[in-house]
Amino acid sequence: MGPKSKEYENPSSYKNDEDNDDDGDFVLENVMSEEDIEIETPSRNRKRVSTTRRTPSKPIRSQPLTPSSSKGAGNEPKSQNSSTTRGSAKKQSSKGLEEKLINSYGTHVESLNKGRRLIEIWKYYETAPGQSSFEGQTSSDSKLQTLLNLDGQQLLSYSENPFYLFEVKNLSISFHFESPQQVEPCQPVNPFKENPQKSGFVVNTGIPLSSVSWLPTNKETQFLAVGGMLKFSETTESVFMRTSGRNQIQLWKLENKTNFKSEFILYHDWGSVLQLEWCPTISVEDSILGFLAVVCSDGKLRVLRVPRSPVKFHVFVEQADFTFGFNDSLISCCTWVSPEHGDIHQILVGCSNGYLALWDILSSQECPLFYIPYHDSYIHNVVQCLDDFPWLFLTTAFDCYTRIFDIRDPIIDNRPLSHKRDICYTITWNNMLQSIISCSESQSVVIESLRGTSTQLLDERNGSIISLSNSKFHPFVACAASDGIVTIVNPFRLLGFSHKQKANVHRIFQLEYSEKQDSYRMLDGFRPRLPKAKKLDMYIYPWQIQVNKVEWNGNKGYAGWLASGMACGILRVEDLSAVERR
């Protein structure tokens, strides 16, 4: 059933691999001096300083430096600390930290001070922190009012589905090394019975999941919308073809962090669900959960008014509140546009022909605000740089370019940020780091500076990176790939220490599949590790274990909950902040 993996049953047995490192020597200064921002001369122009050899052989006594001996030493700082080898190492490391800080936060004093505070708070965490780390965090409680005037949606409730129901089957899943058990469709299973410190659920949804999205809310009850493809298959239709058919969107409810159940199911005839995204505001109406943007394989974007308590469990959506599409292209992705001031009523979409379109839902015009060429091929992702740069947007496409543009003038203020040798399937914006998290060469997760000055490696895999997720409450990046593994990484461990410091990769779980036995095995309890230095090979994994989407919960008090959707139909939601550790 796949390669054996090293496991640990007790999460409290985690150890920090860098306990023996001299990390305490690298301390960021509060104010940068002129010496800190000077560029050092190459090491070959410096005068070599003799040091004491720490070997069993006969020691060599080092001579103290004199003012005359320090002449011609290039641009080395002329301070008392620089007269010793240890002091010089500290100074060089400090400059490396300041350089990385400037690459991420720029030269503005306020941004630099904010970055220093965040680094000091988060740089010591190698795994997901406990719930106490999220206390004091604030969330955006903007109200959803402007979209409540829409009244074009038609819902049909029925007790018995007059159409065909999806043919779903039980999945044989073994958790850890226990014997396999049959998981029935839409029946949550608690895989952490033997470990009361952890909290989470595993569900057989019965559909090949492709998108998950948490509902923004300020209440204790959480809602999760999940959607998937039309059928279970290793191959799918071309993304440039319009396809339609009966599909469903499931809505799951999490109550008091202990009860997870299916609330209701929305049926539609729009084909495979490519993307689900809730409007990032809170509804003021008790009868409405929120507005859900849905991109399907028929090439259209729809906005659904999701009711809080429908009359029946099965609901068929005959017509949406808002439908947007083109005749000459397919809509491939979307994102809600959050303005600096005012309510949210605009949606930015990417198309299969490389065009971008901005649509105002409240506008009486039937055409978008702009429809401009931007990429040379299918646009796969559109991301807004919230909260510090709400006017900037990032896009990735099948032309292997990552571009950035200003929505206030997208025709002039746009430029390519990077060009990769392979398609970038996912990209996300980390506001705490003020940097871009994306995949490179299919297998690597990298940090790209918004200013285009540096790139740092976060994680490497044997499979293609499919999905990345960030949170506004913590800096941890969730990574999902075709190898069936979900990991989280703390990028602040790269900024808070020296150049040699690497970020620990914490494997949350690993899904394996046996074709011979037609059963799955889900492993967890892994110890955080450092990324491998050797070059990794690309493997072809069974399509059933591919993790198509990971999503952090963006609500206050639930920021540690992570949802993962897999191609075999398994949905896993887990509270990674349940264990208090550091």
Swiss-Prot record:
Q: Name one GO biological process term.
A: transcription by RNA polymerase III
Q: Which gene encodes it?
A: sfc6
Mapped WD repeat ranges: 221-262, 268-314, 326-369
Q: Which cellular compartments is it found in? A: Nucleus
Q: What does this protein do?
A: TFIIIC mediates tRNA and 5S RNA gene activation by binding to intragenic promoter elements. Upstream of the transcription start site, TFIIIC assembles the initiation complex TFIIIB-TFIIIC-tDNA, which is sufficient for RNA polymerase III recruitment and function. Part of the tauB domain of TFIIIC that binds boxB DNA promoter sites of tRNA and similar genes. Cooperates with sfc3 in DNA binding. Localizes to chromatin insulator sequence without recruiting RNA polymerase III and plays a role in nuclear organization.
Q: Give the organism, scientific name.
A: Schizosaccharomyces pombe (strain 972 / ATCC 24843) (Fission yeast)
List GO terms (cellular component aspect): chromatin; cytosol; nucleus; transcription factor TFIIIC complex
The root-end lineage is: Eukaryota, Fungi, Dikarya, Ascomycota, Taphrinomycotina
Q: What is its main location?
A: nucleus
Quote the biased-composition stretches of kind Acidic residues, using this chain's numbering.
18-39
- Where in this protein does the record put region Disordered? 1-97
Residue ranges with Polar residues bias: 63-87
| Protein name, UniProt field | Transcription factor tau subunit sfc6
Assembly with partners or alone: Component of the TFIIIC complex including sfc1, sfc3, sfc4, sfc6 and sfc7. The subunits are organized in two globular domains, tauA and tauB, connected by a proteolysis-sensitive and flexible linker. Interacts with sfc1, sfc3 and sfc4.
What Gene3D superfamilies does this protein map onto? YVTN repeat-like/Quinoprotein amine dehydrogenase (2.130.10.10)
Iron listed as a keyword: no
Keyword annotations from UniProtKB, A to Z: DNA-binding, Nucleus, Repeat, Transcription, Transcription regulation, WD repeat
Q: Which GO terms describe its molecular function?
A: RNA polymerase III general transcription initiation factor activity; tDNA binding
